[in-house]
A protein has these predicted regions:
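Activation segment signature within eukaryotic-like protein kinase domains
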Residues: 20-21
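A conserved short helix/loop substructure at the end of the activation segment
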Residues: 172-191
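C-terminal lobe substrate-recognition/regulatory segment of protein kinase catalytic domains
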Residues: 134-177
Length: 246
């Protein structure tokens, strides 16, 4: 999906975006119903097959959840898609970490650029609060008790309709639910699939009609895995009888 988002020659319609989100949430709902957290959702880990069917991939950080008082590492999820509770060092968390990542992916589909590209954990939190507003204790009661909590300046945030200017009210409601600061009230995959956004028109585009990347398969592999490009260059160098240091 990352390649699709970055390909500016492709037009992503509201129906395309709805299809990608529908398949993402359906896959995530299945995982969560089977007590599994993905913990590394991002566009690069959402793969599309030749029929346009989206698959969740890379389960290297996946973990079962649901055991009472079970602690986990907070160093999960690629930073740009990491929920604020993880950035504050939470060791006990649930499906909310995946749902926050879904919100970041949805925002990236709409904007065609990463939504909150922080340079460090502190910068990531700053970008989140500058964009979405600094949460209060009323909005997120357990925030101050998290291991790595630090106090931030009170940012008012930017209204979502000013960020996603082409989004309708139903889509804005979904985005709002995905970006709730309190993970206990953040929308779940099952709840998201029942929102008006998915029942309202336009409907999702069938997989076979979704846009395809305009670049060759080998180029796609190199974009998603730099090691493939390095291997190709090394092979070409050997074939030409040259010595290269990679």
């Amino acid at each position: 999906l990352q390649v699709i988002i970055k390909d500016n020659s492709l037009v992503l319609t509201p129906s395309h975006i709805k299809a990608y989100m529908l398949m993402t949430l359906q896959g995530l709902e299945y995982l969560h119903q089977h007590w599994i957290l993905h913990r590394d959702l991002k566009p690069n880990n959402l793969l599309l097959d030749e029929n346009g069917v989206l698959k969740l991939a890379d389960f290297g950080l996946a973990k079962s959840f649901g055991s009472p008082n079970r602690a986990y590492t907070h160093q999960v999820v690629t930073r740009w898609y990491r929920a604020p509770e993880l950035l504050f060092g939470a060791r006990m968390y649930g499906v909310g970490v995946d749902m926050w990542a879904v919100g970041c992916i949805l925002a990236e589909l709409l904007l065609r650029v990463p939504f909150l590209p922080g340079d460090s954990d502190l910068d990531q939190l700053t970008r989140i609060f500058e964009t979405l507003g600094t949460p209060t204790e009323e909005q997120w009661p357990d925030m101050c008790s998290l291991p790595d909590f630090v106090t931030f300046k009170s940012f008012p945030g930017i209204p979502l309709q000013h960020i996603f200017i082409a989004a309708g009210d139903d889509l804005l409601d979904l985005i709002q639910g995905l970006f709730l600061f309190n993970p206990c009230t953040r929308i779940t995959a099952t709840q998201a699939l029942k929102t008006q956004y998915f029942s309202n028109r336009p409907g999702p585009t069938p997989g076979c009609q979704l846009p395809r990347p305009n670049c060759p398969l080998e180029t796609l592999k190199e974009q998603s895995n730099p090691a493939v490009a390095t291997k190709r260059k090394r092979t070409q160098a050997l074939e030409q009888g040259k010595t290269f240091i990679f």
